[in-house]
Amino acid sequence: YGTNRDALLLQLTQGLDVILEIDWQGAAQVLKEWPDALSIFILPPSREALHARLIGRNQDHPDVIQARMAEADETLSKAPQFDYWIVNDAFEVALDELRAIVLASRQRRARVELQHERLLKMLLGEG
């Protein structure tokens, strides 16, 4: 798969919020290049729910589902490396949590410092 780097850079320079749906290995690559990027780990509500979702997709052979469940342990063990965790139990709740994280990230000092630098100087009587 892969993400088009040029398209990503264009979106970032336009000030857009960019959300990448990638695995933990892809997240590690992104964070290596952009250490200030936010990382969000989406957790299933339970192992049973994860298994039921894989079966419910009706796309994979039972052997593939079994392999995916085995891979889930390694994937889930990477969660502590992420900035935020969202439990995807109720979709709308998970979506609201994602929106809240994105909204809060827009106010990080690193993101708004240049935008508000003049205002801060004026408030401090320096400009």
Language-model regions, residue ranges each:
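ATP-dependent NMP and nucleoside kinases share a basic, alpha-helical "lid"
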Residues: 2-59, 76
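Alpha-helical elements of Rossmann-like donor-binding domains used by nucleotide-donor carbohydrate transfer enzymes
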Residues: 7, 71, 97-101
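Residue-level signature of catalytic and energy-coupling elements of molecular machines
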Residues: 19, 72, 86
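NTP-dependent small-molecule kinase module
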Residues: 59-60, 77-127
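Glycine-rich S-adenosyl-L-methionine
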Residues: 62-71
